[in-house]
Amino acid sequence: MMVAARVVMAAMVVLAYAAGVSAAADETADKKLPIEQLIGMHDLTTAVSIGNYYLKQESLVAIRNLLTRLGKEEKLGPDWNLRNPLWQRAEDMLSKRVMAKVAEDFSTLEWLRPQWEDLDSREFSAAELDVLLTHFQSEVGRKQAKIVDHTVSTQVIMTLAFSGKLKDIAGVQEERSRMQHIWNKEDDDMRFSIEDATNADGQRFAYSALGKKYFVTAILKLTGIISHRIDELALALPKEVNARADQVRPLLQEFKSGRG
């Protein structure tokens, strides 16, 4: 009898565990569409432009270090420098190829979506996601989504600036101008009057427990994920650039031949 009772109890434990797993799977499935829709309310174009600007800067630093090293190895002399047309061709070639890789690994944000979905799934219940989605689909909610996006981009650039990572180097003017233009437009778009009576719902949401929780999740945690990705890619750039050394050697030989 005792053996039978133990078997029954073990079976009940297994069934309870299976039911728990099934319920968790059902809840995850219920969250999937609201999370996708909620993420779709946001636009991280500005944060991407900031990352592109910094990664272009770091790619040029790595490329110029490589070209300098190759010049020393090949004994090309002082004329092999940033002003030389063949250097510029080599730099441009490498820059385009490296930044194409950056576009794949960062700018598309394909890497971010799974992490963002997982973050929202961990932080919010299905009921909370429904409330969030309803709010952000409203006019004032869409405005607050822009505020979140702008705050994320501001935190990303502040992280880079305060850590001394942004440098003033030649070759990043286009990326810097684009970043500044997008940032300024986003700054204008997200502004609204707090005296407008229609913003009462927005203020109630901002001060609510769920609103505060969302802003912390979306701003602090999302910023951390983006900043980590930027740092990770920046650290990998020298290796990525050095692996392409053979691609510019014909230009070094052309420089040698032209020098006579």
Explain the meaning of each model-derived region:
Residues 204-260:
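A cross-kingdom marker for long, charged
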Residues 62, 66, 89, 93, ...:
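Charge-rich, solvent-exposed alpha-helical interaction surfaces
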Residues 8-17:
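Bacterial N-terminal signal peptides
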Residues 30-111:
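Early exported N-terminus immediately downstream of N-terminal targeting peptides
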Residues 46-55, 59, 63, 120, ...:
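Surface-exposed patches in mature extracellular/periplasmic domains of secreted proteins
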Residues 18-26:
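Boundary at the C-terminal end of the N-terminal hydrophobic targeting segment
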Residues 110, 115-216, 220:
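Extended amphipathic alpha-helical interaction segments
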Residues 1-9:
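Bacterial N-terminal signal peptides that target proteins for export
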